């Protein structure tokens, strides 16, 4: 029987499903159930700890890659408590949030004043060719590797022609598994590039964060992809 991860456990496996069996239906569902329960339980402390994080580099990267003068319709995919959602709205864009954690959805609606959809990343229901940009900041790494190709195709489909996906994820050596009560996948650039291009995206560029530090002190891989 599948067991939830302990808060002090670290269990990682290679993401190559050719050599590693896929997760069963129950195991797959639990990657969301347990991860979302963690965020719901710690929503307030998460908000206090991330509210002042400066990710303006990431927001600007997306906005500067969009064609036309705007305003743009932007999906904040994994919006959390709504920090970036509010910034996009304050800049005059039509920003819509999406998160699977109910506490985050409530916080984001209250803080940003934006429409926020409560959707599990594994059970998305997105409109076709609706958004100019998708801002996936620190969110897609929670999608198990066997489901990520499908989720990336769904994000491709919800973008208008020429739309742009921004993603930023903690990078690694192509492994996935439990870190405490959160499930995550940690890719290098080559593997992430392969996944995104197979979903139909064209790479616009990438960079590592935080800026101005040696590469071994830059744990985040950010990249931009055009439909």
Model-predicted segments: where are they?
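Class I SAM-dependent methyltransferase SAM/SAH-binding core
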Residues: 81-123
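Conserved beta-strand signature within the Rossmann-like core of class I S-adenosyl-L-methionine
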Residues: 162-169
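Acceptor-substrate binding/catalytic loop of class I
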Residues: 175-191
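A short acidic, Gly/Pro-enriched loop at the edge of an enzyme's catalytic core
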Residues: 122-134
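Core SAM-dependent methyltransferase catalytic element
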Residues: 211-227
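A short glycine-rich, Lys/Arg-flanked "PGG" loop and its adjoining helix->strand segment in the class I
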Residues: 149-161
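Conserved class I S-adenosyl-L-methionine
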Residues: 10, 16-80
């Amino acid at each position: 029987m599948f067991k939830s991860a302990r808060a002090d456990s670290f269990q990682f496996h290679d993401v190559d499903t050719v050599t590693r069996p896929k997760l069963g239906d129950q195991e797959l569902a639990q990657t969301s159930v347990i991860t979302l329960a963690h965020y719901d339980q710690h929503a307030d402390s998460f908000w206090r700890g991330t509210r002042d994080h400066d990710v303006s580099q990431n927001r600007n990267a997306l906005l500067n890659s969009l064609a036309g003068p705007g305003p743009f319709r932007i999906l904040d995919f994994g919006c959390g408590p709504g920090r970036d959602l509010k910034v996009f709205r304050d800049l005059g864009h039509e920003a819509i949030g999406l998160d699977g954690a109910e506490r985050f959805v409530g916080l984001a609606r209250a803080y940003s004043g934006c429409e926020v959809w409560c959707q599990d990343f594994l059970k998305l229901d997105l409109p076709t060719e609706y958004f100019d940009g998708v801002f996936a900041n620190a969110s897609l790494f929670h999608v198990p590797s066997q489901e990520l190709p499908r989720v990336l195709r769904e994000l491709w489909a919800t973008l208008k022609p020429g739309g742009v996906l921004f993603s930023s994820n903690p990078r690694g050596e192509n492994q996935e598994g439990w870190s405490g009560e959160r499930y995550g996948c940690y890719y290098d650039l080559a593997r992430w590039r392969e996944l995104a291009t197979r979903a139909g995206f064209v790479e616009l560029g990438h960079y590592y964060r935080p800026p101005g530090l040696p590469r071994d002190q830059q744990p985040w891989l950010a990249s931009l992809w055009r439909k």
